[in-house]
Design a protein with these regions (language model features):
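Glycine-rich phosphate/diphosphate-binding loop of Rossmann-like nucleotide-binding domains
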Residues: 2-42, 46-47, 230-234
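Structural motif
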Residues: 7, 64-65, 121, 128, ...
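Glycine-rich beta-strand-to-loop/alpha-helix junction loops that act as flexible
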Residues: 11-13, 68-76, 150, 206, ...
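N-terminal small/polar loop signature for handling phosphorylated ligands or for N-terminal nucleophile
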Residues: 26-79, 84-86, 107
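Short beta->alpha linker loops
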Residues: 44-47, 97, 118, 182
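Proline/glycine-rich low-complexity loops and linkers
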Residues: 51-57, 78-169
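An accessory alpha-helical subdomain
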Residues: 144-239
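Conserved short beta-strand edge segments in small beta-sheet-based binding/regulatory domains
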Residues: 239-251
Length: 251
């Protein structure tokens, strides 16, 4: 059985201009990792339909799942739903369940359900809805493409409705060995040897520097094989200790 994979497509001019800092990639990847679904690629595209269509079609052909964020709000530049419909070659219209739920929600708030708000009930033909417990306007699923809101709080809430629909893979275990005061260049040769001897384990090094008194290297190992991971962990701890550093462990 082929292990499932995922890609994330971030949509929005505000991301590319630097006005908005993305955190959706991080939270999607963190949600999927315990399910055994690694994020293999991330792209960011502007609010241009042709760019969105091209990216969606490229990613959905390559990966098990694609998660898009952004562009499903009530304004003129929220064009993601139209772009997804174009990518799949289908029409788009208001979903009756979305209209019903949103009308009830706005009615309960004594807020007018305006034409602009109704735009958020439009989904490609054949799509199923993704629940939005935060603001009510749904996301949707079109085959292997899940379309989420750009607001991080809403996107994260939508993942809870998506999770049960996903085909999961082998759970990846992870261990982090932190060495304060270590320098990445001093570790490079030995770290490469450890990684080469354990092909079933992904080994990486991530330096940090917060101040002259708070810096070092985090050595991170990941694997679906708990035994192989334990062996690499021991070697990473020994590597840190060989420089007179007491390793700090995070699992």
């Amino acid at each position: 059985m082929t292990a499932p994979t995922a890609a994330v497509l971030l949509i929005g001019d505000e991301l590319l201009s630097g006005r908005t800092r993305d955190i959706n990639l991080q939270q999607i990847a963190q949600y999927l990792e315990p399910l055994g679904i690694p994020v293999m690629e991330c792209r960011t595209v502007p609010d241009i339909q042709g760019e969105i269509v091209a990216a969606v079609n490229a990613l959905r052909a390559r990966y098990t799942y694609v998660f898009t964020t952004g562009g499903i709000g009530p304004t003129h530049d929220d064009i993601t739903a139209d772009a997804i419909a174009a990518a799949f070659g289908v029409g788009i219209s208001e979903h009756p369940d979305a209209i019903r739920d949103m009308a009830a929600r706005y009615g309960a708030m004594n807020t007018e359900f305006t034409p602009a708000r109704r735009r958020m009930a439009r989904v490609p033909h054949g799509a199923s809805l993704v629940a939005n417990p935060v603001s009510g306007a749904p996301g949707f699923r079109m085959e292997n493409v899940f379309t989420l809101a750009g607001v991080p709080q809403i996107a994260r809430a939508m993942l809870e409705d998506i999770g049960p629909r996903l085909k999961t893979g082998a759970v990846v275990c992870k261990v982090t060995v932190k060495g304060r005061g270590l320098r990445e260049g001093d570790l490079a040769v030995r770290l490469g040897e450890i990684a080469a001897a354990a092909p079933g384990v992904s080994v990486g090094s991530y330096p940090w520097y917060r101040s002259s008194d708070d810096h070092g290297v985090a050595l991170v190992a990941r694997s679906v094989d708990a035994g192989a991971l334990a062996a690499v962990r021991s070697q990473l701890e020994a590597l840190a200790a060989s420089f007179g550093v007491k390793p700090e462990i995070e699992v």
